[in-house]
Swiss-Prot record:
Name the record gives this protein: Argonaute-binding protein 1
Subcellular location: Nucleus; Cytoplasm
Gene Ontology MF, one: endoribonuclease inhibitor activity
Organism annotation: Schizosaccharomyces pombe (strain 972 / ATCC 24843)
Location (main, coarse): nucleus
The UniProt record lists the keyword Nucleus: yes
Domain of life: Eukaryota
Residues in coiled coil: none
Role summary: Component of the argonaute siRNA chaperone (ARC) complex which is required for histone H3K9 methylation, heterochromatin assembly and siRNA generation. The ARC complex contains mostly double-stranded siRNA. Inhibits the release of the siRNA passenger strand from ago1 together with arb2. Inhibits the slicer activity of ago1. Required for swi6 localization to the centromeric repeats.
Subunit structure: Component of the argonaute siRNA chaperone (ARC) complex composed of ago1, arb1 and arb2. Interacts with ago1.
Signal sequence, start to end: none
GO cellular component, one term: cytosol
UniProt key word Nucleus: yes
Keyword terms of this UniProt record: Cytoplasm, Nucleus, RNA-mediated gene silencing
Amino acid sequence: MAEGDFKNDSTGCIGDSVEFTTFKKRTGKSLGNRRKKRGLSGWEPYFQEPELTAEEKLENETLYSRNIPLTVRMERFIQRYRSRRKWSDPTRIRLFTMYLDLGGVSTGQKQFTGGTDINNDAKAREVSAQTTTDYIEYDILDEYDIDFKWVAGVFLSSHILYNAGLTKEEDLQIACQIVRNFLLSVLHNNVAPEFEDNIRDACLLAEQAETELISNKRLSTKLPGRLQRALASIHVDNYKGLWDKSQSDRTSDSSVNFIESNNTKFMPNDELFEPDGISRFSTQQARDYIQRTLGPRYLTGKVVEQEYLTVKLVSKTLLNFSNQSLCKAVFIVWDPPGSKYSQDTNKERLEVILESDLLNNTVDGTHLEGSFTFLDNGLTILDTVLAVLPTFYEEVKDE
């Protein structure tokens, strides 16, 4: 897998391709048959491939000899790997293809002529091996370094968040498991022994990613938290008085939207339009909550600046407030590796007061993209959170 190869626009067959049906067929039970007998798909969370037989080890030594270029070895391995997994889930297929593409592997269809055409009597697994090929540009190593960990890190951070658009926890888990499953199989079959340490590091990163991405997903639904929402309702123009209008005023408003279904008109759930003092604050609710939690000092202040920033969490310190368990979260302004532009700001360090339970499962080094409002009394308000990003977040450098 090559560092920096964000998109492979090749449409033809570049590099060597191998039809695995040309190898001598094993007389013993194949790995695929043994897996089928065990009733496994190959995608179980803690799946382990069966120990290789002596015959399989010998075949692997032939297929993946270090005398063969790594690009050819990886092409051969990917072909066999695809045939030994069940691909009934379209999300898994899409993510695996995106992962390969990021690493410089282009997926396409073989062209057949003469005696190499598909044997219609072949088993489905053999037909798949004949028809689907993953290609790696033959000269890719002239321009890029091999770095399995880099590819895993970029794929499981910026790529799945902004290119794949994953939002469900289940899909985030699938993405991490795909990378880990694939790399463990590379190790198991001794495809790239010269990169063993790098591949093991990539496997560990995939495990770390699964924990962080799920934690970050849950945190993103809770931020900016009750206190910051209350502060925004007092100080930030976009939120001031947003929930002050009473329900009776809303129903009499000529612009109110009704939902029509089966010729019956009705109002959306009234609770959605009422301030609850938790995620939606009227001005009075916000003032009361801030007074109880922080004291009167934080009710005043003038906005001096507002910026959208990407920041990195560097520390969390518990604060001594009697009515609420709070912490001071310290962030530094941070530009992701590989980002196109540096942030145009004179800010370097931010301090935000948050409920301590929000960050219980958040590790230092986690990144946020959000809108910050700065007051003349030194208070910083995190009024909008756009994304919570993992510690290993990285983007792809422009070519």
